């Protein structure tokens, strides 16, 4: 019964059965030594050797990798023997352990082979396939494994590309995390430095506001002083002109007095009176000159004070410029801080996006593996449906071929009728072409006359036609 089930499953396999020659070529391509007798007349030793090489090539599980777990299990068995049996029966238990060693190794080897067979679409792999191999059975199992190997080679490039992209994204995520940590460290340092410099900044800002208000007051006072200075300068110029004019008058009077003294005195009383008047005028002019000189000295002192104020004002203006420079630097530092915060947020968002993309790629990889398994499951059904569909299409094709012959005859008849109708239409058109041209000429003449009549009536009636 089991052999019949195996034959049915062999006939409905989800993969094509290869010939022994093709299987030998595939094994040679995988660097697995095998001969034709190993496939036509298999033995347990040759079959296990081929399966062991396939496990090592396709799954990376060699015989040496089975040795470690086997020794661990045997050690557990030895621990149980020494725990629940007396120490006198140690040699008997050790002989049992040696007896179990080969059986345990064979069962572990069978488990790996069965896992490979399940992956290749062979669910009925049994111990008899290793202990008592059959040529047809071995050919079926190796055909499934070779199909799996070919499919694996075809999909290895895609898997390697996904793996490479995954490694790149992981590396990029690590770099972004490192950069994010550096930016967070810089941000914390800047925040701490700003917090430490905040009292000084507030004091400097208050001092700047006080200096600014004082500077505004001094600037307004400077404008007033400059205006007053200009007025005093004009007044000083006017007084200097008056002093020069009076000096010229005094010089002329002295010259006149000298010339008068050199003359003969004919009227002493009049001359004395005139001299006393001139002496009084000279004294008054000297008093004016002394007052002008005192006023000029006062103006000079005020000009010196104004010059000192102007120097102080220039110093305050320079201080204002330096304050503005410091304020600009502070604003620039604030802008750089905002830019660093924005960059930090951008890096965090980018890191989150890359992490989400990495998770998405992992989900895509899992979905691709699940999809591959589903495709392997559905491929068998698709093959059966395809075979049934091919048979149905063949039957339908035969029916359609018969119908096609009938339709071909009808088509030929219709083509002959079409040619006759076309010849009749051509003869009719050539016969009545002159009449059609006359009808068209009369139609266009009547249409132009009607349009002229409508335009004339519109103009005479004063109608406005909106188009």
From Swiss-Prot:
GO terms for biological process: attachment of mitotic spindle microtubules to kinetochore; cell division; kinetochore organization; meiotic chromosome segregation; mitotic spindle organization. It holds the Pfam family Nuf2. Keywords: Cell cycle, Cell division, Centromere, Chromosome, Coiled coil, Kinetochore, Mitosis, Nucleus. The keyword Coiled coil applies. InterPro entries: Kinetochore_Nuf2_N, Nuf2_DHR10-like, Nuf2_N_sf. PANTHER family: KINETOCHORE PROTEIN NUF2 (PTHR21650:SF2), MEMBRALIN/KINETOCHORE PROTEIN NUF2 (PTHR21650). Acts as a component of the essential kinetochore-associated NDC80 complex, which is required for chromosome segregation and spindle checkpoint activity. This is Probable kinetochore protein NUF2.
């Amino acid at each position: 019964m089991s052999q019949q089930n195996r034959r049915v499953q062999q006939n409905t396999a989800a993969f094509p059965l290869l010939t022994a020659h093709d299987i030998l070529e595939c094994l040679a391509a995988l660097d697995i030594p095998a001969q034709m007798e190993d496939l036509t007349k298999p033995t347990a030793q040759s079959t296990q050797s081929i399966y062991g090489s396939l496990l090592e090539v396709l799954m990376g599980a060699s015989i040496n990798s089975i040795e470690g777990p086997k020794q661990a299990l045997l050690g557990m068995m030895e621990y149980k023997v020494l725990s629940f049996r007396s120490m006198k029966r140690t040699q008997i238990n050790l002989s049992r352990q040696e007896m179990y060693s080969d059986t345990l190794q064979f069962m572990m080897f069978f488990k790996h082979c069965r896992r490979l067979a399940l992956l290749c679409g062979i669910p009925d792999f049994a111990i008899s396939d290793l202990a008592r191999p059959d040529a047809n059975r071995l050919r079926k199992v190796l055909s499934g494994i070779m199909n799996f190997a070919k499919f694996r080679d075809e999909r290895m490039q895609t898997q390697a590309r996904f793996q490479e992209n995954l490694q790149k994204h992981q590396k990029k995520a690590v770099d972004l995390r490192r950069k994010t940590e550096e930016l967070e460290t810089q941000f914390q340092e800047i925040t701490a430095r700003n917090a430490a410099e905040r009292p000084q900044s507030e004091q400097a800002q208050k001092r700047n506001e006080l200096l600014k208000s004082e500077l505004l007051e001094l600037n307004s006072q400077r404008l007033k002083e400059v205006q007053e200075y200009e007025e005093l300068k004009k007044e000083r110029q006017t007084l200097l002109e008056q002093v020069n004019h009076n000096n010229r008058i005094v010089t002329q009077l002295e010259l006149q007095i000298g010339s008068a003294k050199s003359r003969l005195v004919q009227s002493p009383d009049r001359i004395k009176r005139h001299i006393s008047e001139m002496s009084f005028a000279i004294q008054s002019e000297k008093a004016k000159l002394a007052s002008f000189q005192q006023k000029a000295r006062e103006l000079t002192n005020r000009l010196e004070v104004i010059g000192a104020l102007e120097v102080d004002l220039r110093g305050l203006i320079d201080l204002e410029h330096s304050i503005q420079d410091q304020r600009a630097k502070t604003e620039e530092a604030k802008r750089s801080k905002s830019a660093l915060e924005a960059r930090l947020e951008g890096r965090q968002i980018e890191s989150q996006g890359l992490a989400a993309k990495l998770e998405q790629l992992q989900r895509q990889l899992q979905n691709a593996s699940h999809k591959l398994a589903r495709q392997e499951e559905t491929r068998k059904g698709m093959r059966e449906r395809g075979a049934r569909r091919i048979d149905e299409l063949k039957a339908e094709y035969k029916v359609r071929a018969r119908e096609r012959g009938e339709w071909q005859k009808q088509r030929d008849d219709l083509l002959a009728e079409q040619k006759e109708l076309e010849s009749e239409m051509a003869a009719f058109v050539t016969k009545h072409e002159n009449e059609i041209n006359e009808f068209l000429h009369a139609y266009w003449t009547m249409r132009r006359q009607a349009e002229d009549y409508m335009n004339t009536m519109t103009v005479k009636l004063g109608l406005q036609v909106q188009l």
